[in-house]
Amino acid sequence: ELFARTRPVAAVAAITGTNGKSTTTSLLRHILTTAGRAVQAGANLGLPVLDFDNLDAAGTYVLELSSYQIDLTMGLRPQVVALLNISPDHLDRHGGMDGYITAKRRLLQMADAKAVLVLGSDDEWSARICQDMRAAGRRVVEIAIGREINDGLSVRDGQLYRAAGARPVADLNGIETLRGVHDWQNAAVAFAMAEALGLTPVQIIPALRTYPGLPHRMEVAARQ
C-alpha cells in the first residue's frame, strides 16, 4: 500500500494465483530485462517493494502478490494483472474458500480500468472469474492448457497457440526450466503479460529459451 501511494510512473504488472507466482514473476522479469527494459521485481518474491529503485516511465515493476498482500492493499492500480489459478489455500485466514477467492478477485477489481487481465481458466474458480471479467467489459486474455479456445492463448502438447485452429506461436518443448503442464501455464501467462507491456513475439520467444529458472524449481540434479 505504501508503494502504491507513491504513484509510480513506471508500469506495474501484478501476478497472483495459488501456484506458479514466483516462476511467472521471475520469467517476466527475465523477458523484460532481455528486451532491454529497466525492471524491478519482487514483493512476495525476493526484494521488498519498498527497497525497489525508482524507475522512470520506460521501466516496469513486476509484483508477485499473495492473498495476504492483496488484503492489505487498497490503492494499487496495475496496468497488467495475471491470475494464474485458484485452489484451496490459506482458508484459515480468509474464513473459507469464498473469502480466498474474494481476495484474489480484488486485485483485478483494483486494476486500472484499461488494464489487461491475463486470466487462467483451467479450474472452476478461475474460469468463473474469467467469465465475469469478460461480462464486465474488461480487457481479458484467457490462458488455457490442453484445450483449444477461440480468444486468448492456449498450450497443447507444448505448443503455444493464439487461437483455435491457428499455427503455433512458440514451441515450449525442450526448455529445461519450463518443463511440464504447470510451467506451460506460467510461460503462457508471462508471454501474454510481456505482449501487454509492448513486447513482440520476436523479443519474447528467445528469452523463454534462456530463462535460468528459480533455485529448487525443476532443476537438473544429475545426468547419465
Predicted regions and their residues:
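Phosphate-binding loop of NTP-binding sites
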Residues: 1-121, 125-138
